[in-house]
Design a protein with these regions (language model features):
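Acidic/histidine-rich catalytic cores and adjacent linkers
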Residues: 5-9, 14, 22-184
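A generic structural motif
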Residues: 1-2
Length: 184
């Protein structure tokens, strides 16, 4: 889920930067509306107040006559809507409808960054669909892998494999140990 939303946010950022360069032949500056609203573009729609949403929308509409930045933002929100299907139990009909709506938006826009995003989602759709249907992620595994790498990095090369394995198990079970200590 996180990685897909990050891909959507990265596409919005790439479109914003490219459009700014096309409009001004330079990077964005503080007074440029698309640069000033860059954080709002990355924020979820439900986390924007009506006032900040209206400001973002109107400022960008006034400057970007091609509408590419807002098209990218809408595509990102469509992707988030598709991923939110997991909250309603992964209804297959609703999932197919939202996937079609997302892919159609990206393809109809003919924006290169959105075409790349749509291609990535289409390529990884079987894996994404299994997440939407089941709601199961590999987030816990990735978290444990991060802990193992961190322990190895801090350990500066253990000489004893048993001590290395013991330290990794110690760090990976910290939450469970804290829960059992307080319940006794």
């Amino acid at each position: 889920h996180f990685h897909l939303v990050k891909l959507g946010n990265d596409a919005v950022t790439k479109v914003r930067r490219r459009v700014t360069w096309d409009l001004r032949d330079r990077r964005g500056r503080k007074l440029d509306p698309e640069w000033a609203n860059r954080r709002r573009l990355l924020r979820a729609r439900e986390r924007l107040s009506q006032k900040s949403f209206a400001k973002m929308w109107n400022d960008i509409m006034a400057e970007d006559h091609s509408g590419q930045i807002l098209s990218a933002w809408i595509a990102k929100e469509e992707l988030r809507t598709l991923l939110s299907t997991v909250r309603v139990g992964g209804d297959p009909h609703l999932t197919r409808h939202r996937l079609h709506r997302f892919l159609a938006w990206c393809i109809d826009s003919q924006i290169p960054e959105l075409l790349t995003l749509a291609g990535t989602v289409d390529t990884w759709w079987p894996e994404i669909n299994s997440f939407v249907r089941t709601g199961i992620t590999n987030g816990r595994t990735e978290g444990y892998n991060r802990l193992v790498k961190q322990v190895k990095r801090v350990g500066c090369g253990f000489r004893n494999r048993d001590n290395s394995a013991r330290r990794i198990r110690f760090h990976c079970t910290r939450k469970q140990r804290a829960a059992t200590q307080t319940s006794c």
